[in-house]
């Protein structure tokens, strides 16, 4: 490897893409194309970066498997950052295997981190845990350790393990400072803000108050029956009844939970669950059917009883019932929560992350755009959607993916 290529690679490793480009901008050999692609990615020009990396992968000879694998990893990272979640996973898996087999532990670990970050983004937490298992980051350079601990922190946050998340973020910050890359330090600091953001609202006895993530963790461990409107579930300590695919049942459970220890009139439940302005006999019959289904689903945790004017919810083992609501109740809040990260998402990537159909997501995007809450740019397959981050807006911390759609 010649001196200019070495110097450009060192500049990229130090977070200096302009310094790298000064050395290789006019060269078209395979190593230079790869370095130019990575530099353009660091500068945010993802379209040009992908084109350069594809050219580099083609330019490397058949005996340069490691170099081609590194190009694949770089392409995968660009796809992740640009929210192209449809990028082929198998290509990254194959590249990771090649790098591992040839002793390139640093880039193999980076490939695994990308795999985990994608799984984390689309809510497949168990698979993300499995990918991380057995990876020892201690021998990795500081920048790679930072990336690893950011992933560990992200998993811990999604699992409401705030102590583990703080410890991972502290390790990530120390490693980022050791690496001396300002952008990496800023990324860690941004991730740490999640622990200080409002994660939900506690609704009980006619009042509500905001909760931080560690307070949500304490709530889930307490002797309280929680109607979880963030994950569409009913939980008491370690027992969880998911209603994520039963939106009508969850709507009824939430209404009964908010009214506890009182009851909810039948006509009010019809209006809430079925959006009917006037309850006729067919509505009441449907309500009886849905209440019967809810009663069966909640048998381990609570009892749904009939009262003179409606229905009430009574916990079986818990002391009280509360509702954990998102920071802001917003139509299509799951879509807005993902867009709140400030990145530009395609509708197909949103559908993958939410486990919803493309048609459902497209309809939600059109309604949000009509309301002026998001903006779209580009045409056809290149169309992307984004929104400014709104203070107090529901984060994706509590989103399990998939959630029920209309």
Where are these regions (language model features)?
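Residue register of alpha-helical TPR repeats
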Residues: 2, 31, 38, 70, ...
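"A position-specific structural signal for the A-helix of alpha-solenoid helical repeats
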Residues: 6, 35, 67, 74, ...
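Amphipathic alpha-helical segments of tetratricopeptide repeats
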Residues: 21, 28, 54-60, 93-104, ...
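Short boundary/linker motifs that mark transitions into or out of structured domains
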Residues: 185-250, 254, 296-333, 337
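Positively charged, aromatic-enriched patches within helix-turn-helix-type DNA-binding elements
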Residues: 252, 256-286
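DNA-binding patch around the recognition helix
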Residues: 280-323, 366-383
């Amino acid at each position: 490897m010649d001196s200019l290529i070495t110097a450009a690679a060192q500049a990229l490793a130090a977070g200096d893409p302009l310094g790298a480009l000064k050395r290789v901008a006019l060269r078209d050999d395979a190593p230079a194309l790869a370095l130019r692609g990575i530099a353009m990615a660091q500068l945010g020009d993802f379209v040009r970066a992908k084109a350069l990396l594809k050219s580099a992968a083609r330019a490397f000879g058949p005996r340069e498997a490691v170099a081609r694998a590194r190009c694949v990893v770089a392409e995968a990272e660009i796809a992740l950052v640009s929210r192209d979640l449809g990028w082929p996973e198998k290509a990254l898996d194959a590249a990771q295997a090649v790098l591992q087999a040839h002793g390139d532990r640093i880039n193999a670990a980076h490939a695994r981190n990308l795999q985990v970050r994608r799984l984390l983004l689309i809510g497949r937490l168990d698979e993300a845990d499995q990918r991380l298992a057995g990876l020892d980051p201690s021998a990795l350079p500081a920048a790679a350790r930072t990336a690893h601990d950011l992933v560990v922190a992200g998993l811990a946050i999604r699992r409401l393990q705030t102590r583990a998340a703080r410890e991972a973020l502290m390790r990530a910050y120390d490693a980022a400072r050791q690496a001396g890359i300002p952008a990496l330090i800023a990324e860690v600091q941004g991730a740490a803000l999640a622990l200080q953001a409002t994660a939900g609202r506690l609704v009980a006895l006619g009042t509500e108050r905001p909760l931080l993530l560690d307070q949500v963790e304490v709530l889930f461990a307490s002797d309280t029956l929680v109607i979880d409107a963030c994950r569409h579930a009913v939980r008491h300590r370690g027992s969880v009844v998911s209603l994520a695919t039963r939106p009508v049942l969850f709507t009824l459970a939430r209404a009964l939970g908010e009214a506890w220890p009182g009851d909810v009139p039948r006509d009010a439940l019809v209006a809430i669950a079925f959006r009917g302005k006037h309850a006729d006999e067919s509505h009441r019959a449907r309500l009886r059917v849905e209440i019967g289904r809810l009663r069966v689903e909640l048998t381990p945790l609570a009892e749904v009883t009939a009262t003179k004017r409606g229905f009430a919810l009574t916990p079986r083992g818990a002391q009280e019932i509360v509702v954990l609501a998102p920071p802001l109740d917003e139509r299509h809040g799951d879509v807005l929560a993902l867009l709140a990260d400030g990145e530009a998402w395609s509708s197909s990537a949103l559908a993958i992350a939410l486990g919803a159909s493309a048609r459902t997501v497209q309809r939600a995007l059109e309604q949000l755009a009509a309301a002026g809450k998001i903006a779209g740019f580009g045409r056809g397959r290149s169309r992307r959607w984004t929104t400014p981050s709104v203070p107090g807006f529901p984060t994706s911390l509590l989103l399990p993916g998939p959630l029920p759609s209309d």
